[in-house]
Design a protein with these regions (language model features):
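N-terminal exported-region signature
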Residues: 8-60, 162-403
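Glycan-association/targeting regions that enable binding to alpha-glucans and other polysaccharides
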Residues: 59-175
């Protein structure tokens, strides 16, 4: 059967309609059958609605998402002139544009580089060497097809190898931008993996010393290797501040993805940041309390600082583990942290905290927090921690549960 339907200036020719459904009234049309299980037209809206059947099937094909794959080398060197990024985008509608998005470690802004087409489905662009540094980067591709549907690739997170003297403590994002002051114990760490992390035997009589302190037993040992994610106690008696750099070893900047830090011991552990920009630490999607020792300013006061959940490059931190092998998650980008913690960002008016601070001429203790939280319980719970151990002379704030 062939029929012609005329209505307000448009023509629809159909064949083999298995049945018609409903009466035509008020300038409306509804056809039910093999071609369009439901084809309806409402004169008031000047539109056609397709529901199932052949027309709907064809329409569904054009709405299928783009198949998008990207290709970047797993390991990149800062000495390269550029880094080639390639994307293969397969879409029945054709691709209107492809853009490479780049985010440098520690940066909020996203750089966008238009990609050029090699053929109908392959796109390419080069990342300039000016973006290759110890902070590393992550990248992803966004394509738009001819129907303006958008597709987003997975993140590419390469390892970045850097040369000697590229990793420096006197960086603006460092805990010690002016170096470590003299005659004070401070915790230091290296925010990258050194391929040769050997430490020479040190002695304070010779000018400086490194120690690994077991905070459970109180035992002090001299380390012989720098390990990423671990911090060390350091003291020197030179006239000038000490600034560390990787002058004897090339290194690797870790991929910019969630990084796991394993706490070896039950109780207090010493950790450092594996990244050369500030990062946030979580445990079970909740912020972790980290404590560093002393401030690196002219006051030269010693003691435990206020708790934080942010790891700053080159510093070391004490963190408490409820059990050996507990794993912390290091989040490399703030936007990821915001997404993960969106539900926990609401402030409950019944919750409160108070930081108790004690300071003398040469010593301080800012480590104690009291308060009320929905995650807390009456009596001892996971939020309660024993006092941090003391080093040499000190002042301290002490509290007791139910005391």
């Amino acid at each position: 059967m062939t029929s012609w339907v005329l209505s307000q200036g448009w023509v629809l020719k159909t064949k083999h309609i298995s049945q018609s459904g409903g009466l035509m009234s008020n300038d409306s049309l509804k056809l039910v059958g093999a071609i369009g299980t439901s084809i309806s037209y409402q004169g008031a809206q000047d539109s056609i609605s397709l529901k199932g059947g052949f027309f709907s099937s064809v329409s569904g094909i054009y709405k299928k998402p783009t198949k998008l794959l990207t290709e970047v080398n797993d390991t990149i060197k800062t000495t390269q002139d550029s880094v080639n990024v390639q994307a293969v985008a397969i879409d029945i509608n054709g691709i209107r544009s492809a853009t490479l998005n780049i985010q440098i470690g520690g940066a909020r802004n996203i750089l966008k580089l238009p990609m050029y087409s090699i053929n109908d489905s392959t796109y390419q662009v080069s990342i300039p060497d000016t973006l290759l540094s110890v902070r590393n980067f992550r990248s992803w591709v966004v394509t738009v097809d001819s129907m303006y549907y958008e597709a987003i690739s997975n993140y590419d997170t390469p390892v970045l190898e850097f040369s000697e003297n590229e990793l420096k403590m006197d960086d603006t994002l460092s805990r010690y931008p002016s170096g470590v002051i003299s005659n004070r114990w401070r915790m230091v760490s290296w925010p990258a993996e050194l391929l040769n992390g050997d430490l020479k035997n040190s002695n304070l009589k010779d000018g400086y010393v490194f120690y690994d302190w077991d905070m459970q037993t109180g035992e002090w040992t001299k380390p012989d290797t720098i390990i990423i994610g671990k911090a060390y106690w350091f003291k020197h008696n030179f006239d000038d501040n000490v600034i560390f750099t990787n002058n004897n070893s090339v290194g690797r900047a870790m991929p910019l993805m969630d990084y796991e830090l394993t706490l070896k011991d039950t109780g207090w552990n010493i950790i450092g940041s594996p990244f050369s920009f500030p990062v946030t630490v979580e445990y079970d999607s909740l912020p972790v309390s980290l404590y560093t020792y002393g401030y690196n300013d002219s006051t030269e006061t010693d003691g435990w600082t206020e708790p934080t959940s942010t790891l700053i490059p080159w510093s070391g931190y004490a963190v408490y583990a409820q059990h050996a092998g507990q794993k912390l998650t290091v989040k490399t980008f703030e936007n990821d942290i915001i997404e993960n913690n969106r539900s926990s960002s609401r402030v409950d008016p019944k919750e409160w905290t108070l930081n108790l601070r004690l300071k003398s001429e040469n010593y301080l203790d800012y480590s104690t927090i009291i308060g009320r939280t929905n995650q807390g319980k009456d009596g001892k719970d996971l939020l309660d921690r024993p006092a941090l151990p003391a080093i040499e002379s000190y002042v301290a704030v002490r509290t007791e549960i139910n005391g």
